[in-house]
Amino acid sequence: EQQELIDATKDKFTQETYKDEENGVSLDYNLFIPADYDASFSYPLIMFIPDSSAAGKSSEEVLSQYYGADIWASDGEQAKHASFVFCPVFSETVVDDDFNTSNQIDTAVKVLNQLMKDYNIDTSRVYTTGQSMGCMTSLYLNSLYPDLFAASLFVSGQWDINILKPLENKKL
């Protein structure tokens, strides 16, 4: 069933590259645009961040190995609520168990901001999720940008509780 989902959705994503002129980092990413995208209507966006085993893999491999992005682009989910799906493809581990981070995370946020400018994305309905490294990255992003995401789904991750202090009274 998982492989069927991947096979049915992976080709619905486009593979893009963003060049961060500020820090020189290039970031590949997968982007799903709702099938009947209408620029006069605003859409939610879900950012899915895979675990560290995806680091260094191609955009296509990330979609073929993991279904965290694919599930949101499935016909069933899109029928319920058409949405954009953004899946950054990191060339390295972007956060580790000692809470060290990569500047690729900053570039992913720049891509997200650019997508919100390029498309009619409802900035009050931007979500993040991911497992393991993806969860940790989502936690980190919530600590840096506590008002960026409407909600987050954290799966199998951890983060330094002191860094998360700004989120203490926020409903995630």
Predicted regions and their residues:
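A domain-start/cap signature at the N-terminus of enzymes
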Residues: 1-44, 129-133, 141, 153, ...
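Extracellular/periplasmic catalytic domains that process cell-envelope and extracellular macromolecules
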Residues: 22-24, 38-42, 77-81, 121, ...
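Gly/Ser-rich "nucleophile elbow"/oxyanion-hole loop immediately N-terminal to the catalytic nucleophile
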Residues: 36-37, 41, 94-132
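Alpha/beta-hydrolase fold active-site loops
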Residues: 44, 83, 125, 150, ...
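Active-site machinery of serine-nucleophile hydrolases
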Residues: 45, 49-107
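Extracytoplasmic/secreted cell-surface and envelope-processing proteins
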Residues: 55-57, 94-98, 135-139, 159-164
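Conserved hydrolase catalytic core segment
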Residues: 140-150
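The feature captures the conserved acid-bearing segment of alpha/beta-hydrolase catalytic domains
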Residues: 150-172
